[in-house]
Amino acid sequence: KERGITILAKPTSVVWKDTKINIIDTPGHADFGGEVERILGMTDGVILLVDAAEGPMPQTKFVLSKALSQGLRPVVVINKVDRSDARAKEVINEIFDLFVALDANDKQLDFPILYASGRDGWCNYELDQKRENLHPLLDLILNHVNEPEVDLSKPFAMLSTLLHSDTFLGRCLIGRVVHGIAKVNDTVKSLNLNNNKVEEGRLTKLFTFSGTDKVATDTVTAGDIVCVAGLKITSVSDTICHLEVNEALKTTPIDPPTMSVTITINDSPISGLEGKKVTSTMIRERLLAEAETNVAISFAENEKKDSFEIGGRGELQIGVLIETMRREGFELSVSRPKVLFKDENNKKLEPFEEVTIDVD
């Protein structure tokens, strides 16, 4: 989390009544929008978590609109109902109005509601019921969310949705297996959105998720959310598949950067007073590592010596990167942001933002 907003999506899982439930937290901000759509593509249902006092927030509207457009049926959880300023009943009316405003269909409007306190670890269908545990939520997930439609007879195919770097394994790709089975040491290939082959490689390691840990496994099957290692240049939105497969899985392309800043070494008189990592080589390596694992960030070396151009989808995204680097002990100078233009068919195109202002 950063500034109260989830900025990275991380998968986990729990086993309840002999059923494995995969859980993924999505980012809630438009700057990380491409990731939201890809994450929702891995799911069969969603839990909409709303604060009992604050009600639906702007990011609630953004993520919910994406979920409803994909046909997912939400479970609504009103959290923090034990707050002194909680107004659960009013918040439910606000949520229903939001569903209607976002053109939810009849099935989506008939959403189940649970009242909860995440801090104390309980949830119930009614506010005055005994407050014990989260079993009602787990039971509701089993009853309300459809099982994944899988076909084990088809050749292996999975969609790369998340990317992270591991010191020992190198590039690791996380995604959901859509159909088929894969084993360690299988030879696979990857396809981009245009069905062009990206590379061919061997699956050196396979992991599933349990709690907050990655668990090594020899075999993965359709429906699993897995992490694979062994591919060197495959990225997010690529399809990892059996050598026989020639058609990539449909997904949302990565949103291009809309703005950039120039990052240089700190050459001010107070250089070196706060941070330990002050050289351009250190800054360059850190930015390259970020661009490798964060597909929404672009990196380019500037014509000017020791300066680097970093592109992202908004001020929040770039601000979070700079703040993280500062905490890690880096010192750097940052230019004012500039808008990125694009030339297409001899026309100059610029990014635009859609603003919705709610007035009560």
Which stretches of residues belong to each language-model region?
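Structural and coupling elements of P-loop NTPases
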Residues: 1-360
